[in-house]
């Protein structure tokens, strides 16, 4: 088909793909196939992303697996087309992964992708916002995980507010970030502390395998902090709420 994008890794990335996906490489190729066809047609992946689906998306996300302990439960917040959560589930059959995404069009794609890749035993899709999932609001069942992942969802302060309550005590937020990681840490470390998080750490994943390595900010959930209570409305002299 003219213009069709191949789902197999380009030759220069074949070694990295084998290293990161091992004997699950054919499953990763099947997922890439869904992304570059259905994912593009349904508007989950930009057409310009299709030719770089391996280096910018699949390998970039799979590199983060090295930061996730064996047998972890993972909540991927703002999964979109499954990045990084579905990639991690493909690369790591030991993980139990929940893909959290508020938009129905995206969760529909995710549910179909999970079924087509035969991953239903280890992956569930939950429609909702991170802040609802933490509190059990909006009719969504409250969930927590050992590791909470997020890529391209929000700046670090908002991400910490949404995601730290989703990590079990002692669990971690692993946020995939770009070149801004060090500045984001400097800017938001005080807020993270107030939210019960430990000192944010910047790690580079996949060094020597993917170029450039994937930068992540990791924050441990050290303390459980009650959510901020809404401020009471100001009263007028007559004691009535304004
Ligand atoms: C730019 S997309 C990134 C998607 C995917 N993580 C990726 O890297 O391709 C941001 C995603 O976050 C989702 N999102 C936005 N606010 C959210 C919230 N409060 N809770 C959970 N997901 C949210 C959006 O619906 C969207 O799918």
From Swiss-Prot:
One of its GO terms (cellular component) is cytosol. SUPFAM superfamilies: S-adenosyl-L-methionine-dependent methyltransferases. One of its GO terms (molecular function) is rRNA (guanine-N7-)-methyltransferase activity. Its EC number is 2.1.1.-. It is found in: Cytoplasm. Keywords: Cytoplasm, Methyltransferase, rRNA processing, S-adenosyl-L-methionine, Transferase. It is an enzyme of class 2 (transferase). S-adenosyl-L-methionine binds at residues 78, 83, 130-131, 151. It comes from the Bacteria. InterPro entries: rRNA_ssu_MeTfrase_G (IPR003682), SAM-dependent_MTases_sf (IPR029063). Belongs to the methyltransferase superfamily. RNA methyltransferase RsmG family. Specifically methylates the N7 position of guanine in position 518 of 16S rRNA. This is Ribosomal RNA small subunit methyltransferase G. It comes from Salinispora tropica (strain ATCC BAA-916 / DSM 44818 / JCM 13857 / NBRC 105044 / CNB-440). The gene is rsmG.
